[in-house]
């Protein structure tokens, strides 16, 4: 399928930003191109876009994870709050919607962050983690950090991986392929930092393209 000039322009801008390592600008343009291509059922075109998006988000993640600490956030998330690159653990009284706003505000200000949102401990002593997007809610439960006041980088990394794995488990392989594509896109909207979800989306787009032949 031939791309529209608008979609190709978005991809060109994304690729230019990628060359400049302007990862957040690249991400924004790849996302626009992905949404427009999905609207046209251009599955083959989406595969290339997803790969570009994966690279851009890897760049964002690399910059966000340079700082070797985890910042705990339990106060209001606002557009004017003090933000710097790094890892953020959003915790009560804040909720998943606050974590999503934090990601959105950081992108708007061109600040690379990685975000995990936790909920209160369960009776079993586990910590629920959550990620949300419109129409998508993903939850999992993990072991708490040894020191809840100072969660380690390793614990944070494990939490990011766990919520991504939980998202993958929500994808039913027996579901119609275009529905799976949309479900994975929703998961990526909630968890932009998970690389296996990008791989799964590309694979599912390939399946959709083959079915369309």
Task: Label each region the model flagged.
Residues 24-61, 187-201:
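Short, charge-rich amphipathic alpha-helical segments embedded
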Residues 83-137:
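Extended alpha-helical scaffolding regions
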Residues 11, 15-19, 25, 38, ...:
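Hydrophobic/aromatic side-chain positions at a characteristic register within alpha-helices
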Residues 51-76, 208-213:
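Alpha-helical linker/edge segments of TPR/alpha-solenoid repeat scaffolds
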Residues 7, 14-17, 34, 47, ...:
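Conserved small-residue packing positions in alpha-helical repeats and bundles
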Residues 147-213:
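Extended, charged low-complexity segments
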Residues 3, 10, 29-30, 45, ...:
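TPR repeat positional signature
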């Amino acid at each position: 399928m031939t791309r529209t000039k608008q979609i190709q322009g978005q991809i060109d801008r994304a690729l230019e930003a990628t060359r400049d390592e302007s990862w957040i600008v690249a991400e924004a343009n790849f996302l626009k191109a992905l949404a427009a291509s999905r609207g046209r059922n251009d599955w083959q075109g989406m595969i290339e876009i997803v790969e570009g998006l994966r690279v851009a988000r890897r760049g964002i993640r690399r910059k966000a994870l340079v700082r070797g600490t985890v910042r705990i956030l339990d106060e209001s998330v606002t557009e004017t709050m003090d933000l710097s690159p790094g890892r953020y653990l959003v915790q009560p009284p804040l909720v998943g919607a606050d974590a999503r706003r934090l990601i959105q505000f950081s992108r708007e200000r061109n600040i690379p962050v990685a975000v995990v949102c936790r909920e209160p401990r369960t009776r079993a002593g586990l910590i629920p983690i959550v990620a949300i997007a419109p129409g998508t809610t993903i939850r999992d439960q993990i072991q708490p950090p040894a020191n809840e006041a100072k969660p380690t980088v390793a614990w944070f990394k494990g939490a990011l991986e766990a919520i991504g794995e939980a998202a993958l488990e929500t994808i039913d392989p027996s579901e119609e392929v275009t529905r799976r594509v949309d479900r994975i896109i929703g998961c990526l909207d909630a968890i932009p930092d998970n690389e296996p979800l990008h791989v799964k989306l590309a694979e599912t787009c390939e399946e959709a393209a083959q079915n369309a032949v």
